[in-house]
Amino acid sequence: MKAKYGVALAIGSFALGVAAIQTLHAQAKPSVYMVAEINVRDKAGYEKDFLPPVLKNIKENGGTYLAGGFDKAQAWSGLPVANRYVILKFDSMDHAKAFYNDKQREFERTVGGKYADFRIIAVEGGEMK
């Protein structure tokens, strides 16, 4: 009788462990890094009209500013660099997409487009293979 309980307990513990591992693995989504390559033509207008609402949107969607600024990048090979780069970090691609939604793209096109040209790239983090 004790052996049956021992086997049942072992099977139950194994199943619980498998379920816990699957749950933890499913929650481990990679961070997403968003790189903005921006050629600003009118710095004063960009900083006054465009930047404040964008910074608010980044914060509201869980973004973290990692690096960037005006004239901070150096080209080591390839094409010349833009005059402004920004690197943001989001917890997941879903958070990055929530930030860079239709409303943000429209604002970038209509307001930001008066002052700058943009290229935005999102990259999932992960291990190099």
Residue ranges and their predicted role:
Residues 1-11:
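Bacterial N-terminal signal peptides that target proteins for export
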Residues 16-97, 124-129:
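Short S/T/G/P-rich N-terminal loop/turn motif that feeds into the first structured element of a domain
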Residues 50, 100, 112:
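Short, flexible helix/strand-to-coil boundary loops that buttress conserved ligand/catalytic motifs
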Residues 62-65, 104, 116-120:
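Secondary-structure boundary/capping signal
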Residues 104-110:
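A common structural junction motif
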Residues 110-129:
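C-terminal end-helix/capping segment
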